[in-house]
Amino acid sequence: MNPMPSALPSDFLHVDLVTLSPLILLAAAAVVVMLTAAFYRHPRPVMILTLAGLVLSFMALFLSQGTASSQVTTLLILDQYALFFIGLIVVATFVVAILCYRYFGGGESRHEALYILLLLAALGGGVLVASSHFASFLLGLELLSISLFALIAYPRFTEHPLEAGIKYLILAGFSSGLLLFGMALVYAQLGTMQFVKIGTMLAAPGAALELYGLAGLALIVTGVGFKLALVPFHMWTPDVYEGAPVPITAFIATASKGAMLVLLLRYFLMAGAHQSHSITFALSLIAVATILVGNLLALLQNNIKRILAYSSIAQLGYLLVGFLAFDQLAIEAVAYFLTAYFVTMLGAFGVVTVLSEGFNGGSAGEFHDAGEKDSDRLADYAGLFWHRPWLAGVFTAMLLSLAGIPLTMGFIGKFYIVTAGVEASLWMPVITLVIGSIIGLFYYMRIIAVMYGWGPEAAGEAIMLRAASPSFAESATLAALALLLIWLGIFPAQLIGVLEGAGGGLT
């Protein structure tokens, strides 16, 4: 008679639980917030619990570092690479949660469910960046997407968010269908859904994807292209960015897109997809088109949210240039640029959020429930410097970083990306990146000129002057983002050292 299998060692369980603790704490925070909202309907304690859960999850990342490079299950790998980007997503969610409070009416409104959805979306993003299997890929993606549907359409009495939510729902469902079909085709040929096993099988002598396997890989890239808003899958982005509440737009632009890009890089490197010349050539064309289309269409916009939407499309094109190098330098370049992109977009949308609070003289809750528009027209920012100089300064720093001006994180990030592209001989994407950056200067400087170009007497009639003053938490958050942007733009060595360690396990 065979002996019964022994139980798992306690130290094994301890290591796994410690490694998974950032994700476990996010899930636990969502449950606690849900129960609190059910028994005590007031947004302040719910927001405080949300922020506390995010802080605990972030602190748990430091405990997980000692057990990193751990394949805790067949579905998840919590290495330094995953932990770094989970931390980035948690920080982005923390900032968005702070921005949401007054935007949705502060203590006078009932928006407790918003924080539950934010925590679930952050959990979905965390699962995505740690995925090493198609099942966890799909689980994280759907958890993130379903939360975003509700977040985008959250203001109940407004037409624009509902329209944006429906658009996102339809296109996200379509892209998920493409991803599923692509995964099925890859599985049909290789018989496995683990990224590492896919890479091992394709690395064997004489092994290659057959036609339907290549079709499956192409469908996966197409589905991810929709999520990242890469050209020609970008058409939903301006409408959703314009219609969604401003803090939620910030979350989509940062945590949602960042998680998808991080997952795509892991999949390409672990599964050996970067060895397919047809796929890399197609991605090169997509990168070139994304940079040009994003920058050129941004020139035609008079709405701040639409300008930032097209700018985010172009920024993802820049990231693809570094992505295509597929080496250690490329991983560091993508990680640094993505970090700069998070900081910059959170700061830019943070300023728009603050100026949209209490717009038209009412409280934030009255304004947004009344179906009025955000403070997002370019004309609303005329003379901002003369009455809100520090807000104009923060917004200027963010725009200069997006443009890649020296002494900002954006400059270091672009320099890193160009270096990786040149070393990989990606001449056409690199040249396009330089051209796109020059085009981008025009619409970034246009916004800056509007903020500084009007005199005090003309600015006195600007609509944005009736916006509410930012809270201490909002002011501190925006100031921290601006200081971080400049500090890491001048002294990037410490962050680069962290990224070298984080990306080392992927190559």
Curated annotation (Swiss-Prot):
GO molecular function per UniProt: NADH dehydrogenase (ubiquinone) activity; NADH:ubiquinone reductase (non-electrogenic) activity; quinone binding
Keyword Translocase on entry: yes
Keywords: Cell inner membrane, Cell membrane, Membrane, NAD, Quinone, Translocase, Transmembrane, Transmembrane helix, Transport, Ubiquinone
Enzyme class: translocase
EC number: 7.1.1.-
TM regions (residue ranges): 17-37, 46-66, 81-101, 113-133, 134-154, 168-188, 190-210, 211-231, 245-265, 279-299, 307-327, 334-354, 392-412, 425-445, 478-498
Record's keyword annotation contains Plastid: no
NCBIfam families reported in the protein's UniProt record: NDH_I_N
Sequence similarity: Belongs to the complex I subunit 2 family.
Subunit structure: NDH-1 is composed of 14 different subunits. Subunits NuoA, H, J, K, L, M, N constitute the membrane sector of the complex.
Name of this chain's protein: NADH-quinone oxidoreductase subunit N
Organism of provenance: Nitrosospira multiformis (strain ATCC 25196 / NCIMB 11849 / C 71)
